[in-house]
Structures are given as structure tokens and as C-alpha cells.
UniProtKB/Swiss-Prot annotation:
Residues 1-200 are annotated as: Disordered. The lineage of its organism: Eukaryota, Metazoa, Chordata, Craniata, Vertebrata. It comes from Rattus norvegicus (Rat). GO terms for molecular function: ATP binding; chromatin binding; chromatin DNA binding; DNA binding; DNA binding, bending; DNA topoisomerase type I (single strand cut, ATP-independent) activity; double-stranded DNA binding; protein domain specific binding. This is DNA topoisomerase 1. Residues 24-39 have a biased composition (Basic residues). The modification N6-acetyllysine is found at residues 174, 282. There is a cross-link at residues 105, 119, 155 (Glycyl lysine isopeptide (Lys-Gly) (interchain with G-Cter in SUMO)). The record marks 318, 366, 414, 445, 503, 534, 576, 634, 652 as: Interaction with DNA. The gene is Top1.
Length: 767
């Protein structure tokens, strides 16, 4: 029985393949014949179609009965399938003729939908497929046998095509997905940036819009992680030797560490200064063992060359690091910043300015400091005082150590403090300049200076009257106050001899620091100042003064030696007390702030031209800023690369001039062509050349403005006055009034520092 079934199945399959080959050969001929006979047989085909539909309904009934019978019997009749396969071709031809060109619409009206049509593909046997526009889709109506008979081949082809279609769609989907992802990324990136910017904007603490704390209270809650200590000393490699008197000498770890501090500075001018060398050697010997002290008795016999070369090589290696190595270091620093660089103050995350404690090294000081070269010792946890709120988590000290003290003082702004060993001064870890505490302090400073504006005329009248006082102390105070007001001099603090550099302020002026000229350069009553100011920067100025001031100075200098104090009956304490009596909160610094800010405002009004472009306006701003820096004696040494950078800038200017000359020639030539041709095309060319010339002129102007700006400010430090003495609201108002982007005046850090001023100021602000 099973053998018969196998025989029947193989016979059916063979017949099927034979019929299938006949079908492909006759396919195109049948189509052509149908196309020709289409019009003649139209009515006949419709009748056949109707007849076919009625037959289809009958076949469906028969099919249902057969299906019921099959389910009851539990098997299918394979012999009947064999006869049906033999008659396949005949039925196929009848079905195609019956279908004809019957419309889909009509088929649906007859109560059934057409089965899926078989895709016709051109064969490789030399036949040409008829034009698509001439062929109407064929619908295969079902006859009485078609309901229960479907050739295996057709079914297999349909399934394969369906699978192929799905696979193609999936592949297309996979190919398209990256594009969609890229598009999504491109769309998402700006959205993410906007969201991030919006989130940052929301996170910014607009403390200036909140109610201020009671007087003296700085915060209500403060929590932080404490300081980051300098890494421990790493001994030098065995190959790096120290020589004393031409012989190799192995140093103890402590002595070696201090020796490396000197070796790192070997090429610096500091190591040639006698005071530096003397202080270093004295402190270095304190770190030596007894044997080392007995051996090393002369610094000149010490050879630090190999140490110095080793550190230079280390420095060069850091410069030559790969991107991956630099990125790794950057990530480590960012991780450290994230953990230690922020604190929580009154439920807001605030940036800490200097969370790393300075490593040990050699003290340099400002100017010719008498303690330069001394050893700055390593700061340990036992030196540290922590300040935080009582309900905050106290930062943990490094393992095996403890803090010197933990305080909960909300009347101070520092987080960590310690005492350094050189000057005995207290050092602090404070918040970033963009923090609320620093911002409030700045705001108060400028508001105090604005209050001075209301009473400055009264104060000036007062000190003018005091020039005539019978008391020498009052006269000296009045002249000193005149200098502080007119010249923006610092008050000058009293200093212990030998403890700090010999810098001078108003109250500490000596007779040797001034020269009096009844007439100089066509001006009367000129005072010539020449003294070391803050950071040992020389203050040199020739100033015409009022006659009574000049006469008083002559009086103050009578019978005095050059090293004697000019104001021998005055000190900073007496002066500051007098200033407080004149106005609450008034100090010499308030006078400097007032004069600096008012000078900037006046200079901007004088120098800014409404019709200037943005680069020219920026030059005007820098010139106004320069006037303030000169007033406050904010000088600097010209940068080492100044000459080279100016040469590079001049080369750019020369190249731009050549480009402009060529562009002007092109414009002239285009205008000549336009006169001859007189057509729209040449007119467009002329306009294009004009725009090119204008663009190059603007670029040249920018470069020339930049060169002028650099030259004028090569020895002037604009940043000091901009950050510390100029009310930022003056700058913000000027930018808003004249359409100058604030980014052109303040960098990102400065914008964060002055966020309060940028937010609250409009263009009508007056200091």
C-alpha cells in the first residue's frame, strides 16, 4: 500500500513538471491571442464569468461537504487527486479564458474576492513580454474543482514569494535603520543640547532674586568632602644621581625630596639670587640626616644636573602623550572634580574654587621677597580645620589621620583652613567666584561704591578744608585722602621689616618716593612719584596737583631724611577710622572701585561712536578699560611671545591688503564690462565683486583693530580692573545699548562670575 502511494506521488509530481513546462511555453501566446480577441469576446466572456461565478458557488458547497467527509473519515483521497492532476492543463486554460478581462469591481459585486494573481515574469526563451500598459491584470475565477484543488507548485511559489518579499522588507528595514538612527541622532542631538542647556538654566541659582540672609549669616547648611592632599613623594629612579663635590651621594628620602624642588627650578633666575639660595640651603639642611649635614656644607658644590634633566624629560614626555593617555588623565581629573570640587550650600550645589591643597615646594613670594627660597612644608590632615554645618556629614580624613579641628561657623565663608609655615598666615579653601557668597560680596562692594557717589562731593570739600587745618595730623590725612581719591592709590599696610617685600602704599610713602617740581613740562606744581607698589610693580607717575597740596608736601618733607615717612603722623588705622566716620563701609578700596567704575562709564560715553561696527566698539571698550588700568597702576611685563605674535599678525594684515587690492581690481574690471555689455548678468557680477570688497575691508579692519589693541595693551593688565574694580553692570548696559555680544567682552568664567549683573541689568543702567 505504501509503495502504491509512493508510485502515485511520483507520477503526480512528474505530470506536474510536464504541465508546468507546457504552461510557460504557451503563456505569452495565450496573452497575445486574448488581447486580439478581447473586443469580440467581451460579452461572451462576461456571460462565462457569471456562469463561472454560479459554478463557483456550487463548488464551494461541494467543497464543504467533501471537507466534512474528510474529517469524518480522517484521511484524504489520493486517487482522486491523481485524476485531477492529469486534467490540470485543461482546467487551467478554461479558467484563464473564463477570467478574461473581468473587472475587479464586478467580481466583488458577484460576492467574492479574486485569489492572488501569479506574477508574470519575462522568460529567457526569446519571447518579449507585451507592453505593461496594454495588459490588464488577470483574475482567476474559481470553477467547481478549484475550490478543493490547488496545485502544489503554485502554492509553493506563492509561499516562497511571500517569504522572499518579507526577507527583502526586513533587509531593507535593516539597511534603512542606520539612516533612521543617524537622522534620529541628528534630530536628537540638538534636542539633547537644548534640554541640557535648559536644565543648566534651571539649575542656576538666581540668588539675587531671593530674600537676603540676616546680617552676618553666610549660610544655613554646608556640606563638603574636604580637601584633596598632594600625592606622596615618589623617589627618583636609581639611574638619576646627585653629586656633591664631584662624587655620587645617595640622599635620604626627605633630603632628596627637598633637593628635587631646587632641581626643578635650576634654569630659573630665582636659583641665581643670593637670598633664595641662602634660604633654601638653610631649610634643606633641616631635612638632612646628621651624616648628610656633615658632608654637605656648601651649596655651590652640589650638582643637581641629572635631577634637572630627569624632570625636563618627564615634562617633555607629558607633552608627547597620546590622545588616549591625555584623555585618561582628563577623565581622572574630572572624576576628582566631581567628587571634591563641589559642596552643598543651602540645598544648592556650589563649585569650590581651590579644593586641592598646594604641594610642598620652595617659596617664591611676590617681588623681591626676603623669604624666597624657604621650604613650604607638606600640609597634613592634622593641620586642617574643617568648617561645615552641624547636621552635615563631616568629611572623612585619610586613613590613619585625623583633622586638627571641626567647626560649625556659619558667619564665615571658608570650608577648610590651615596655617602655612612661611609667613604664618592662614590659608583657606573658598567657593568659586560664580558662587552666591562671592557674588553677593561683589554686589555689595559695587553698591557701596555707588553710595559714595552720593556723598563724594561733600567728602572732597571736607578734605580741601582740612588742607588748611592747624593740626599737622589733619593736614597729612587730608593730603593722603586726596591722593587716594585722585590717583586711586592703595592705603598701604604697616609691615614688619624682613617679613615681606618692601612694597609701598599711600600711608607708607617715604620722602625718597616723591620729587616736587614747581614747574615741569609746562605744568605747575608737579609731583613725581616713583615707588614699588603691590607685587613690587613700579609705580611711576608725574601729576600736577593743587597749589595748597604742593605747599603741604613741602612742609611734610622739611628736615627729613630720604628714608623717613612722608606722612609721619598717619597710619592706615587712623585713615580707615576717618573714612568710616565719613561714610559707613568706606575704605580706600571703595574709593578705587568708585573712581575705576566712574572712569569707565565716562570713557565709554566719550569713545563710543553710534555708527561704528562691533570690532571698533570693542576697541573703544578696551581703550576705556585701559584708562582705568592706568589709573589703578595695573601693569604687566610684555608677553615673551609678543614680538612674534605681532609679526604673525602683521603678516596676516599684509596678506589681507593684497587680497583687497586684487578684489578692487576685479571690481573695476567688472564695472568696465558692465558698461559695455549692459546686461543683467554683468550687473550681478558687479554686485558680487562689491560684496567681496566690502567683506575683505571688514576683515582687514578687524585685523588692524586687533593689532592696535595688542600694541596699546602690551604692558597693561586689563583683566585685574575688569574683574575687581569695574561694576559689571556698566559693561552689560553698554553691550545691550550698542548691540555688542557680551561674549566679546566677558569670557565664560567671567560671565558665570557676573551672572547676577547680566540678568538684572538693562541698557539704561547708570553707575
Amino acid at each position: 500500500m505504501s509503495g502504491d502511494h509512493l508510485h502515485n506521488d511520483s507520477q503526480i509530481e512528474a505530470d506536474f513538471r510536464l504541465n508546468d513546462s507546457h504552461k510557460h511555453k504557451d503563456k505569452h501566446k495565450d496573452r497575445e491571442h486574448r488581447h486580439k480577441e478581447h473586443k469580440k469576446d467581451k460579452d461572451k466572456d462576461r456571460e462565462k464569468s457569471k456562469h463561472s461565478n454560479s459554478e463557483h458557488k456550487d463548488s464551494e458547497k461541494k467543497h464543504k461537504e467533501k471537507e466534512k467527509t474528510k474529517h469524518k473519515d480522517g484521511s484524504s483521497d489520493k486517487h482522486k487527486d491523481k485524476h485531477k492532476d492529469r486534467d490540470k492543463e485543461k482546467r487551467k486554460e478554461e479558467k484563464i479564458r473564463a477570467a478574461g478581462d473581468a473587472k475587479i469591481k464586478k467580481e466583488k459585486e458577484n460576492g467574492f474576492s479574486s485569489p492572488p494573481r501569479i506574477k508574470d515574469e519575462p522568460e529567457d526563451d526569446g519571447y518579449f513580454a507585451p507592453p505593461k500598459e496594454d495588459i490588464k491584470p488577470l483574475k482567476r475565477p474559481r470553477d467547481e474543482d478549484d475550490a478543493d484543488y490547488k496545485p502544489k507548485k503554485i502554492k509553493t511559489e506563492d509561499i516562497k514569494k511571500e517569504k522572499k518579499r518579507k526577507l527583502e522588507e526586513e533587509e531593507d528595514g535593516k539597511l534603512k535603520k542606520p539612516k533612521n538612527k543617524d537622522k534620529d541622532k541628528k534630530v536628537a542631538e540638538p534636542d539633547n543640547k537644548k534640554k541640557k542647556a535648559k536644565k543648566e538654566e534651571e539649575q542656576k541659582w538666581k540668588w539675587w532674586e531671593e530674600e537676603r540672609y540676616p546680617e552676618g549669616i553666610k549660610w544655613k547648611f554646608l556640606e563638603h568632602k574636604g580637601p584633596v592632599f598632594a600625592p606622596p613623594y615618589e623617589p627618583l629612579p636609581e639611574g638619576v644621581k646627585f653629586y656633591y663635590d664631584g662624587k655620587v651621594m645617595k640622599l635620604s628620602p626627605k633630603a632628596e625630596e627637598v633637593a628635587t624642588f631646587f632641581a626643578k627650578m635650576l634654569d630659573h633666575e630665582y636659583t641665581t639670587k643670593e637670598i633664595f639660595r641662602k634660604n633654601f640651603f638653610k631649610d634643606w639642611r633641616k631635612e638632612m640626616t646628621n651624616d648628610e649635614k656633615n658632608t654637605i656644607t656648601n651649596l655651590s658644590k652640589c650638582d643637581f644636573t641629572q635631577m634637572s634633566q630627569y624632570f625636563k624629560a618627564q615634562s617633555e614626555a607629558r607633552k608627547q602623550m597620546s590622545k588616549e593617555e591625555k584623555l585618561k588623565i582628563k577623565e581622572e581629573n574630572e572624576k576628582l572634580l566631581k567628587e571634591y570640587g563641589f559642596c552643598v550650600m543651602d540645598n544648592h550645589r556650589e563649585r569650590i574654587a581651590n579644593f586641592k591643597i598646594e604641594p610642598p615646594g620652595l617659596f617664591r613670594g611676590r617681588g623681591n621677597h626676603p623669604k624666597m627660597g624657604m621650604l613650604k612644608r607638606r600640609i597634613m590632615p592634622e593641620d586642617i580645620i574643617i568648617n561645615c554645618s552641624k547636621d552635615a556629614k563631616v568629611p572623612s580624613p585619610p586613613p590613619g589621620h585625623k583633622w586638627k579641628e571641626v567647626r560649625h561657623d556659619n558667619k564665615v565663608t571658608w570650608l577648610v583652613s590651615w596655617t602655612e609655615n612661611i609667613q604664618g598666615s592662614i590659608k583657606y579653601i573658598m567657593l568659586n567666584p560664580s558662587s552666591r557668597i562671592k557674588g553677593e560680596k561683589d554686589w555689595q562692594k559695587y553698591e557701596t561704591a555707588r553710595r559714595l557717589k552720593k556723598c563724594v562731593d561733600k567728602i572732597r570739600n571736607q578734605y580741601r578744608e582740612d588742607w588748611k587745618s592747624k593740626e599737622m595730623k589733619v593736614r597729612q590725612r587730608a593730603v593722603a585722602l586726596y591722593f587716594i581719591d585722585k590717583l586711586a592709590l592703595r592705603a598701604g599696610n604697616e609691615k614688619e621689616e624682613g617679613e615681606t617685600a618692601d612694597t609701598v602704599g599711600c600711608c607708607s610713602l617715604r620722602v625718597e618716593h616723591i620729587n616736587l617740581h614747581p614747574e615741569l613740562d609746562g605744568q605747575e606744581y608737579v609731583v613725581e612719584f616713583d615707588f614699588p607698589g603691590k607685587d613690587s610693580i613700579r609705580y611711576y607717575n608725574k601729576v600736577p596737583v593743587e597749589k595748597r597740596v604742593f605747599k603741604n608736601l613741602q612742609l611734610f618733607m622739611e628736615n627729613k631724611q630720604p628714608e623717613d615717612d612722608l606722612f609721619d603722623r598717619l597710619n592706615t588705622g587712623i585713615l580707615n577710622k576717618h573714612l568710616q566716620d565719613l561714610m559707613e563701609g568706606l575704605t580706600a578700596k571703595v574709593f578705587r572701585t568708585y573712581n575705576a567704575s566712574i572712569t569707565l562709564q565716562q570713557q565709554l560715553k566719550e569713545l563710543t561712536a553710534p555708527d561704528e561696527n562691533v570690532p571698533a566698539k570693542i576697541l573703544s571698550y578696551n581703550r576705556a578699560n585701559r584708562a582705568v588700568a592706568i589709573l589703578c597702576n595695573h601693569q604687566r611685563a610684555p608677553p615673551k611671545t609678543f614680538e612674534k605674535s605681532m609679526m604673525n599678525l602683521q603678516s596676516k594684515i599684509d596678506a589681507k591688503k593684497d587680497q583687497l587690492a586684487d578684489a578692487r581690481k576685479d571690481l573695476k574690471s567688472a564695472k568696465a564690462d558692465a558698461k559695455v555689455m549692459k546686461d543683467a548678468k554683468t550687473k550681478k557680477v558687479v554686485e558680487s565683486k562689491k560684496k567681496a570688497v566690502q567683506r575683505l575691508e571688514e576683515q582687514l579692519m578687524k585685523l588692524e583693530v586687533q593689532a592696535t589693541d595688542r600694541e596699546e595693551n602690551k604692558q597693561i593688565a586689563l583683566g585685574t580692573s575688569k574683574l575687581n574694580y569695574l561694576d559689571p553692570r556698566i559693561t552689560v548696559a553698554w553691550c545691550k545699548k550698542w548691540g555688542v555680544p557680551i561674549e566679546k567682552i566677558y569670557n565664560k568664567t567671567q560671565r558665570e562670575k557676573f551672572a547676577w549683573a547680566i540678568d538684572m541689568t538693562d541698557e539704561d543702567y547708570e553707575f
